[in-house]
Design a protein with these regions (language model features):
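N-terminal membrane-targeting hydrophobic helices
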Residues: 1-143
Length: 143
């Protein structure tokens, strides 16, 4: 899935659970693995994966900063968003190195049953997850 999808889901999980951080942290990392099982479309199969990847990382950074500064989420809670998306750094790094099959995170290995789908369905699934995550983040206020 896109990094921004993982980041928003991580923010939502942290907002919904509310702490402590040491409980939320493994849950958001596990959520990354579970979400990678859901059939989705990745820009790594497109003609311009690095461009899409950089835009995705920028959107993820914006979501994190909005949650932290604009919504007033405590730092530890807001940081769970980037933690949830962090495993996807290996995808961008692999693309930048022109070695798209070399990954360190287990749900990105070829042996992992990574969910894949067509573009329309795969983007739609991620849009629904993002929208639901935003609803949870906003509904959980104040933190």
């Amino acid at each position: 899935m896109w990094v921004s999808t993982h980041v928003l889901a991580g923010l939502a999980i942290a907002a919904a659970i509310g702490g402590p951080w040491w409980l939320v942290l493994p849950i958001v990392v596990l959520a990354h693995v579970v979400m990678d099982l859901i059939p989705h479309w990745d820009y790594t199969v497109s003609k311009h994966p690095v461009v899409y990847g950089c835009c995705d990382f920028a959107a993820s950074l914006a979501a994190w900063l909005l949650a932290w500064f604009a919504l007033g989420m405590p730092f530890w809670m807001a940081f769970m968003g980037p933690i949830s998306g962090a495993p996807d750094w290996d995808v961008l790094i692999a693309e930048l190195r022109k070695r798209p099959d070399v990954h360190w995170f287990p749900s990105h290995w070829k042996s992992f049953p990574h969910g894949r789908s067509g573009r329309a369905w795969g983007i739609g699934v991620q849009a629904v997850i993002m929208a639901a995550s935003v609803v949870v983040v906003l509904a959980a206020r104040p933190y």
